[in-house]
């Protein structure tokens, strides 16, 4: 086993090679949305492009380079069609006649009003060999050369980048023939994702249909009405109220608008604020011809200068450009500029509308992707840039053989110790009792829904049914609740819970009934998890008024886990051999605040298994430096779990206390890392785990296996045989595994679709092994991973990622609620705004610190 020293920098970090292919499971014929790319054995020439003035949007840079190639055709470019990435990289199939010299050119673009001149210099960088890439794909080289993959990526994206609106790795075009409004001035645009990926023997182009939210190009007045729910602008005869103005400002700040009062000159501006005063009162210093300045209102100015009598002088103005420049525009002369993507978090309603508009059954998605690729609008078609480099993209999906892994059996308890066998990723608890059920003797009910919504008789009926189901499940709730009262508002949570803790000795659980979305939830979890250390179970009032055995049974799953029970365990004899010695499973995740929320910190969570099943887990959580303090070097460190040494150490100590064993193996599932950052994140984290071990005992060196779990990718798998499709949505069966054809040419990775798809097309999780002291075979690791997907306590189904990785996400998400500052925040919806309102790092750290009574429980279940 290798010792991890500070060792090589991340750039030299070599992940383990694939230990062979898996063989377990029933073969299944599949199609993947990867399209084979034929590349010639040629050299490609890489040039650096420097455009002044700098910091122009990529779209402008592309126009500049496009114009330059046409304009300097005779002298320099000839018939070459360079591929260009919109920043600094340009590739040609034949060298330019400039040798290694730098060449400077001037390019003029027709601008709004006046032409714009750019200075462009082009300089040779290197020769990129596609021959080397082909050798790597055939498995003859240790590493796939990044520079050739990058060159291919730029060349294949060149044409779509000119034709469509690029967003990340996807391309979108304005809606034609469909309209999916999301409300709040937003709408759905459909497009496609495209990325070049090295695979076994071939380069592949991964193509998927995608959708995202854009702002609708419309007059600002209409936008404002949508945001503020104003039915008819003519009914808005008064100025906006403060709360209306704040809401409107939040939505429009940062957006680009264009003016309509100057004829063809549609100048564009970025909004920085909304004025407090209406246009009839908002003044600015108007420069007179005699050099003096006089205060003039915006409404007056528009009347004098443009003979424009404002229709809505009582509405505010947009302040645009730089704050200090005081440029004001009345709402009625502005439109939203087309093609702006919405980066702010969607509301819950918008999200659900978006899902309804975009969810496609697997066969429909397969059909849509195939149509897209064959329609020539994208790849395969007459793309002069691909032709220039001799690149051919096949237009048929890649066929491959996967395997459907056998599902593990699950052991239940009670008198008859039943075993459940999942079918299609699902099993049920009927006639089964928990492996270890907790007896609940002292419990309380707090109802935050109003009495008229949730009458006492309904409450009583709910608690009676809950007791019946809990008894059937082997988690008997003995007797009526010791306390059952109505309450109102988040402010009453803390005093009530304190009273309960003082009054009822041995109180095990508080069941809290919530009236829909409410700040009460965040407060219940803050008080229960961090302040008093009490187990709480929230229930939506709709589930109390109309109960179903399924809902009650699901509540019992969560309650039993929170109170230290064990719902079920993997039947021991079928587990992989890694269980023959003490092993700890760690799950880790770093979650960032939604875009546009610079004030909030990132949260790192690490959980660890605490028994041999593994079923019980403990959590550790930390607040990390927030996004605005980022320089390029720090960009990766922000993705790294910064305090991992102390977190891993805590979990190892706790494992020892729980089991009296020291783990000889550590299996670490890491969620939330993007592909480009994997190696930079893995290296410091591996060292941190090693340090944690050595800090416990100088020669304590358990074998570490480090696996990145990714769900945010665009690989989709489809059944080649219609008869094998499963369920209404026609997805691949749960347990479908792929480790060849579309996977990495030499590294240890695989796709596993461990869950049964319910809505839309299943997204297989992608697993990449970045370190493996434990020398897993492909079969062992794939089976282990699949079995861990069956151990998630919240439901009786196999989930899409292993339980430890899932729990780490839950812990981080719960910490967001702990950070909600109830005096400043509306914890509205799921986008909890855990404002750090100037709270210092110590205060933030304290806010997520779990109470010692709760610390070693599964409070996050």
From Swiss-Prot:
Gene Ontology BP term (one): mRNA catabolic process
Post-translational modification: Ubiquitinated on surface-exposed lysines by a SCF-like E3 ubiquitin-protein ligase complex containing ZSWIM8 during target-directed microRNA degradation (TDMD), a process that mediates degradation of microRNAs (miRNAs). Ubiquitination by the SCF-like E3 ubiquitin-protein ligase complex containing ZSWIM8 leads to its subsequent degradation, thereby exposing miRNAs for degradation. ZSWIM8 recognizes and binds AGO4 when it is engaged with a TDMD target.
SMART domains: DUF1785, PAZ, Piwi
Xref: Pfam families: ArgoL1, ArgoL2, ArgoMid, ArgoN, PAZ, Piwi
Record domain PAZ: where: 219-338
Keyword set, alphabetical order: Cytoplasm, Ribonucleoprotein, RNA-binding, RNA-mediated gene silencing, Translation regulation, Ubl conjugation
Protein name: Protein argonaute-4
Top-level taxonomy: Eukaryota, Metazoa, Chordata, Craniata, Vertebrata
Gene: Ago4
């Amino acid at each position: 086993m290798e010792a991890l020293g500070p060792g090589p920098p991340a750039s030299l970090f070599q992940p383990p090679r694939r230990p062979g292919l898996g063989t377990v499971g029933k073969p299944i014929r599949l199609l993947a949305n990867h399209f084979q790319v034929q590349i010639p054995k040629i050299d490609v020439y890489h040039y650096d492009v420097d455009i002044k003035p700098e910091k122009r949007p990529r779209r402008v840079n592309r126009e500049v380079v496009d114009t330059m190639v046409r304009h300097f055709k005779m002298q320099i470019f000839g018939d070459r069609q360079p591929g260009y990435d919109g920043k600094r990289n340009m590739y040609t199939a034949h060298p330019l006649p400039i040798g290694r010299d730098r060449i400077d050119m001037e390019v003029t673009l027709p601008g709004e009003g006046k032409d714009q001149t750019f200075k462009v210099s082009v300089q040779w960088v290197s020769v990129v060999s596609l021959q080397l890439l082909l050798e790597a794909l055939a498995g003859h080289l240790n590493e796939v050369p990044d520079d050739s993959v990058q060159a291919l990526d730029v060349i294949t994206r060149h044409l779509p980048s000119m034709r469509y609106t690029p967003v990340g790795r996807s391309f979108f075009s304005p809606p034609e023939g469909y309209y999916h409004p999301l409300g709040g001035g937003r709408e759905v645009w459909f497009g496609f994702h495209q990325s070049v990926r090295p695979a076994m023997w071939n380069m592949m182009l991964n193509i998927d249909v995608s959708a995202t939210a854009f702002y609708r190009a419309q007059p600002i007045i209409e936008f404002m009405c949508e945001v503020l729910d104003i039915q008819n602008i003519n009914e808005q005869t008064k100025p906006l109220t403060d709360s209306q103005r704040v809401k409107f400002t939040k939505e429009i700040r940062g957006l680009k608008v264009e003016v309509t009062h100057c004829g063809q000159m549609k100048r564009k501006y970025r909004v920085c604020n909304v004025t407090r005063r209406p246009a009839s009162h908002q003044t600015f210093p108007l420069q007179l011809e005699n050099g003096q300045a006089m205060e003039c209102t915006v409404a007056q100015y528009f009347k004098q200068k443009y003979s424009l009598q404002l229709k809505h002088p009582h509405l505010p103005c947009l302040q645009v450009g730089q704050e200090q420049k005081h440029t004001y525009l009345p709402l009625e002369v502005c439109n939203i500029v087309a093609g702006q993507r919405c980066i702010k978090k969607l509301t819950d309603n918008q999200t659900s509308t978006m899902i309804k508009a975009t969810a496609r059954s697997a066969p429909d998605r397969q059909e849509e992707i195939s149509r897209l690729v064959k329609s020539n609008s994208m790849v395969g078609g007459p793309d002069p840039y691909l032709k220039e480099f001799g690149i051919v993209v096949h237009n048929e999906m890649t066929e491959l053989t996967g395997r459907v892994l056998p599902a593990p059996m699950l052991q239940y308890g009670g008198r008859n110790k039943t075993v459940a066998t999942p079918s299609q990723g699902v099993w049920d608890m009927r006639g089964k009792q928990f492996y270890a059920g907790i007896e609940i003797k002292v419990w309380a009910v707090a109802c935050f829904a109003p009495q008229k919504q949730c009458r006492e008789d309904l409450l009583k009926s709910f608690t009676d049914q809950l007791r019946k189901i809990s008894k059937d499940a082997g988690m008997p709730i003995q007797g009526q609740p010791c306390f059952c009262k109505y309450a109102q508002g988040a402010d009453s949570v803390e005093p009530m819970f304190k009273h309960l803790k003082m009054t009822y000795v041995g109180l095990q659980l508080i069941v809290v009934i919530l009236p829909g979305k409410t700040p009460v939830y965040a407060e219940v979890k803050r008080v229960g998890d961090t302040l008093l250390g009490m187990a709480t179970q929230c229930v939506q009032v709709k589930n109390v008024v109309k109960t179903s055995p399924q809902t009650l049974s699901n509540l019992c799953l969560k309650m039993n886990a929170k109170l230290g029970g064990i719902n079920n365990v993997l039947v021991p004899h079928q587990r992989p051999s890694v269980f023959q010695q003490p092993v700890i499973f760690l799950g880790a995740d770093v979650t960032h605040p939604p875009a546009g929320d610079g004030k909030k910190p990132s949260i790192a969570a690490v959980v660890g298994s605490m028994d041999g099943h593994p079923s019980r887990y403990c959590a550790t959580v930390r607040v990390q430096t927030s996004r605005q303090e980022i320089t390029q070097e720090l960009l990766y460190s922000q993705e790294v779990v910064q305090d991992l040494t102390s977190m891993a150490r805590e979990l190892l100590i706790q494992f020892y206390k729980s089991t009296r064993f020291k783990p000889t193996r550590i299996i670490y599932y890491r969620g939330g890392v993007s592909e480009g950052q994997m190696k930079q994140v893995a290296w410091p984290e591996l060292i941190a785990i090693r340090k944690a071990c050595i800090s416990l005992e100088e020669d304590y060196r358990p074998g570490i296996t480090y696996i990145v779990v990714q769900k945010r990718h665009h690989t989709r798998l489809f059944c080649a045989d219609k008869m094998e499709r499963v369920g209404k949505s026609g997805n691949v069966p749960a347990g479908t595994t792929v480790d060849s054809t579309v996977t990495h040419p030499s590294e240890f990775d695989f796709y596993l679709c461990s869950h049964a798809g319910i809505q839309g097309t299943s997204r297989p999780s992608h697993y990449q092994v970045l370190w493996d002291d434990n020398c897993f075979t492909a079969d062992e690791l794939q089976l282990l991973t699949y079995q861990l997907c069956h151990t998630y306590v919240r439901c009786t189904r196999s989930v899409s990622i292993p339980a430890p990785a899932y729990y780490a996400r839950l812990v981080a998400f719960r910490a967001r609620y702990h950070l909600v500052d109830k005096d400043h925040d509306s914890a509205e919806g799921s986008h909890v705004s855990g404002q750090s309102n100037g709270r210092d790092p110590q205060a933030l750290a304290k806010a997520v610190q779990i109470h010692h009574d709760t610390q070693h429980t599964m409070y996050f279940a």
